[in-house]
Amino acid sequence: MDKKKGILLVALGTPRSCETEDVREYLKEFLGDPLVIQKPRWLWLPILNGIILKVRPQKSAEMYKQIWTDEGSPLMSYTIAQTEQLQGLREDFDVRFAMTYGEPRIDKVIREMKESGVEDITVLPLYPQYSLTTVEPIIQQVKKIDDKINVIRDFHQIESYTDLLAESIREKWQANHYDKLILSYHGIPLSYVTKKKDAYEAQCIETTRLFVEKLGLKEEEYEHTYQSKFGPEKWLEPATIDRIAELPKEDTKKVLICSPAFVADCLETLFELEIENKEVFVENGGETFDFVHPFNDSLEFTKVLSEVIEKNKVEVEV
C-alpha cells in the first residue's frame, strides 16, 4: 500500500563524530542560529567565530568522547530507535527522522518524503515543552520548504507522557529513601521569557506540577531547576549545578535527579548531569546521587509519540 501520510521526528542534532573539527562544525551551525542566540548578528558572530569556535570545540569534544558509544552519538542512536519503533506502530504512515542541526537535514528529508509520494506530513519535534530556542527553529525550517506542513508545538500536557514520566521515577523513588528529587530542565536566558514571551518556563513549571501530583510529592521533597547555562547573561533559575553544590550543606545527602525536558540521552544528560553534577555533589559532601535516564528507546514512550500524532490528527481534522 502506498503511504501518502508521513511523520517526521526531529531532534536537536549531534556532531558527526567526537573529533574537534566535527564538533566545531556542529557548534557553528547551532550557536549561529539567531533563534538560539538572540543577539545582534554584528555583535554575536565576531564573538562566535573569533573566540568561542576557537576554544569551545576542543573542550566539548573531550566531553563527547566520554559519552560516545560503539554506535556513535547516543542521541542519534536513540532517535533512530524511536523512529523505527514508531514506524512499527504506525504502518499507516511513512516515519522518518531529521535533525535541526547537522545530518540528516530537515529540508532534505522532507523533499525525499515528497519525492516518494508522501503528500501529508506531520512534524513532531522531540521536545515535550515548546521553546523559541528548540521548536521554533524547526517550525521556521519547515516553513521555508512548505508552510502547509503541520508542526506539533509541544506535548507536555498529554497524560500518557506525564504518566510515563511518573512511572519512570516511582519505583526508584519509593525504594531508596532519597532526601529530595531534582527535576532539571534545560535552561534558557531569562530575557527570552520576559522580553520574547517564550512559553518554555511556564510549560516546564506545568510539567513539574502534573508530574509531582501523580507521584504525590510534598513541596519539600522536590526541586525544579535549570541546567546548561551558557555565557554571562542571566538565565532561568535556580541553576541545577548551584543547587547540587548547596544541597549537602542543607543536610540533603541523597538525591534522585531526572530531566523531563529530554526524551533521549545526550551530552546534557550523560555528561553534564550524570558525570559533572555528580562530581560536584560528592565533592560538597553528598552521598548518593542517582540519575534517571530519559525514555530513550522505551517502547512505552514510542506509544506516547503515537498518541500525540493521533490527538493532533483529530484536532487538525476538527
UniProtKB/Swiss-Prot annotation:
Gene responsible for this protein: cpfC
Enzyme Commission number(s): 4.99.1.9
Family affiliation: Belongs to the ferrochelatase family.
Subcellular location(s) of the protein: Cytoplasm
Entry GO CC: cytoplasm
Pfam families from the UniProt entry: Ferrochelatase
Pathways per UniProt: Porphyrin-containing compound metabolism; protoheme biosynthesis
Gene3D superfamilies from the UniProt entry: 3.40.50.1400
Species name: Lactococcus lactis subsp. cremoris (strain MG1363)
Keyword Iron in annotation: yes
Record carries keyword Cytoplasm: yes
UniProt protein name: Coproporphyrin III ferrochelatase
InterPro entries listed in its UniProt record: Ferrochelatase, Ferrochelatase_C, Ferrochelatase_N
